[in-house]
Amino acid sequence: MQMDSAQNQFNKRARLFEDPELKDAKVIYPSNPESTEPVNKGYGGSTAIQSFFKESKAEETPKVLKKRGRKKKNPNPEEVNSSTPGGDDSENRSKFYESASARKRTVTAEERERAVNAAKTFEPTNPYFRVVLRPSYLYRGCIMYLPSGFAEKYLSGISGFIKLQLGEKQWPVRCLYKAGRAKFSQGWYEFTLENNIGEGDVCVFELLRTRDFVLEVTAFRVNEYV
C-alpha cells in the first residue's frame, strides 16, 4: 500500500511537469547555498507552483515630463493679411503716392524765378531763411536740410520737436542738429501735405520764439505766378 501511494504521488508530480502549459517553468533553487530545504515543495501549497502563478508586478514605465508652454494659436487670417491692399498701411501708402504725384509739377524756369523774386520781397524783422523746395525735400524720405548759417546760430543743440506755424495752426516737426547742419524729418511730410506745398514753392521760415522754438512759415507757390 505504501508503495502504491508513493507511486501515485510520483505520477502526480510527473504529470505536473509534463503539463504543456508549464513547459517554460523553471525550477527555483534557494538563494542561500547553506539552506538545504528546497524551494519547490511540490503540488498543493507548493511554493514553486505558487511562484509560477504569482501575479508579477508590472514594470513601471518612466513618466515623460511634458514641456510646459503655451500652445501656438492659429494666426488670424485677417491679422496676417493686415498689410494687404485693404489694410491701413496700404491705404496710407496709396495716399502718399497720390499726394506726391499731385504735388509733383512741371515747373518752368520762369515760374520758379517769379516765385523766388516774390519771396525776396518779403523780409521779416525776425531772423529768417528761405528754402526752394526740391523733389528730395518732398518725396525721397521727406527730409529737408536747413541753411548751415542759420542752423549754427539758432539751432545749435536742438534735438527734438519744434513747431512750424502757418496761419493760425501749428505742426510739430522733429529737428535734428548735428555737426553744423540741421534737418527736418518726422512731421515735415504731414506739414507739406496739409498745406499743399509742392515742388518749386519757396518757403520763408521766420523765428518767432526761441523758448518753445516756433518758426512761422510763409509759402510762395509757383502756381500763383503762372
From Swiss-Prot:
One of its GO terms (molecular function) is DNA binding. SMART domains: B3 (SM01019). A motif (Nuclear localization signal) lies at residues 70-73. Residues 1-11 have a biased composition (Polar residues). The keyword Transcription regulation applies. Residues 64-74 have a biased composition (Basic residues). GO terms for biological process: response to cold. Gene3D superfamilies: DNA-binding pseudobarrel domain (2.40.330.10). PROSITE patterns: B3. GO terms for cellular component: nucleus; plasma membrane. InterPro entries: B3_DNA-bd, DNA-bd_pseudobarrel_sf, REM16-like. Residues 129-223 bind DNA. Transmembrane segments: none annotated. Pfam families: B3. Interacts with XLG2. Interacts with ITN1. This is B3 domain-containing protein REM19. It comes from Arabidopsis thaliana. The lineage of its organism: Eukaryota, Viridiplantae, Streptophyta, Embryophyta, Tracheophyta.
